[in-house]
């Protein structure tokens, strides 16, 4: 129950303040393999986390051990019988052995930028003449628009008590798309 409350409080906090939202997005950018609700729980407990996994993955696949005294990060999994808690650990909670695998956190290098720009142009029809940052922003705007078009009714039905509730449908859509595009772009560029 305490973890459900933590999730609710954290969601209110990050959606109520721009700087808190950016801080959350920074954490989310490192944890892109996790869904939003897991990213939210990780942010609430360990905003500095950079690479999280279950005990079994660290110990088995990665041949790393969890340091004594390390506190797991609780994640909530809804089941038919209510909420189930599972734990993950950040790489900073682990230690190495002789046969440990390295944890390489992916980063875009300057040398790889031309290849990434070319791939974005070929695979996603991004404007090849744009800089990488501009391509990312262009694609983020497209994704935000596509999401809005697909989920417009659901979004408009859920905006009570939010800033969007004061807008007509057109203005709410424009505001949502702008915020979503900025968030997508921020996560990718962080």
Residue spans of the language-model regions?
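N-terminal accessory/interface modules of nucleic-acid-binding and processing proteins
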Residues: 1-190
